[in-house]
Every structure is written in structure tokens, then in C-alpha cells.
Curated annotation (Swiss-Prot):
GO terms for molecular function: mRNA binding; translation initiation factor activity. Keywords: Protein biosynthesis, Translation regulation. GO terms for biological process: formation of translation preinitiation complex; regulation of translation; translation reinitiation. CDD domains: YciH_like. Signal peptide: none annotated. Transmembrane segments: none annotated. This is Protein translation factor SUI1 homolog. The keyword Protein biosynthesis applies. It comes from Methanoregula boonei (strain DSM 21154 / JCM 14090 / 6A8). PANTHER family: DENSITY-REGULATED PROTEIN (PTHR12789:SF0), DENSITY-REGULATED PROTEIN HOMOLOG (PTHR12789). It comes from the Archaea. Pfam families: SUI1. Belongs to the SUI1 family. NCBIfam families: PRK00939.1, SUI1_rel.
Length: 101
């Protein structure tokens, strides 16, 4: 097979829906923290790194928001206050808006 088999569900990679199911079930918390010198940082928590590639999601967010950021542990940190836009972008990526707070 070209794509291989998903280790979670056992289906071929082309038919695997594990990531979509994981997106619907996660409770995501978006908050803004103040750092040194009054700088604001948007923190996205509650993402499971085993089901979703946080680096790819972080890269997508940084590109759309035109800001810097990083992945720390199970969270994504973005420079600046982007709380409202992050919720919109997460819904575009397939996350349920009811599970984003």
C-alpha cells in the first residue's frame, strides 16, 4: 500500500477518520496571558498531540495571523491578542465551535 495503515483504527491512511473524530471530541481553551512589559500571548490549550500535529496547526495559525508563536507541551502560544480570530481559524480547520471556549 502507498499510504500504509493507521495504527489507531486499522484502516488504510486514505480512509482513516481518526483525526476528524479527535477534532470533534477535544475541549479547547483559548486564553490571553500577559507577559513581561505588558506583552500579550494567546494560548491554545486542550489539544491532544497524539491525534493532531501541533507543529502544522501552529504554522497554519502563525501564517494566517501574521504573528510569531511556538508549541510548548500540549499548547500553542501565539504572540498578541488573537482570541477571536483563533476561534474562527479552528472552526475552519474542522474543530467544533461548541468545544472552543
Amino acid at each position: 500500500m502507498i499510504g500504509g495503515i493507521c495504527p489507531t483504527c486499522g484502516l488504510p491512511k486514505e480512509l482513516c477518520i481518526c483525526e476528524e473524530v479527535a477534532k470533534e471530541q477535544q475541549r479547547i481553551n483559548v486564553k490571553v496571558n500577559k507577559r513581561r512589559y505588558g506583552k500579550e500571548v494567546t494560548v491554545i490549550e486542550g489539544l491532544d498531540p497524539t491525534d493532531i500535529d501541533l507543529e502544522d496547526l501552529s504554522k497554519f495559525m502563525k501564517g494566517k495571523l501574521a504573528c510569531g508563536g511556538t508549541v510548548k507541551g500540549n499548547s500553542i502560544e501565539l504572540q498578541g491578542n488573537h482570541r477571536d480570530r483563533v476561534k474562527e481559524l479552528l472552526s475552519l480547520k474542522g474543530y467544533s465551535t461548541e468545544n472552543i471556549s
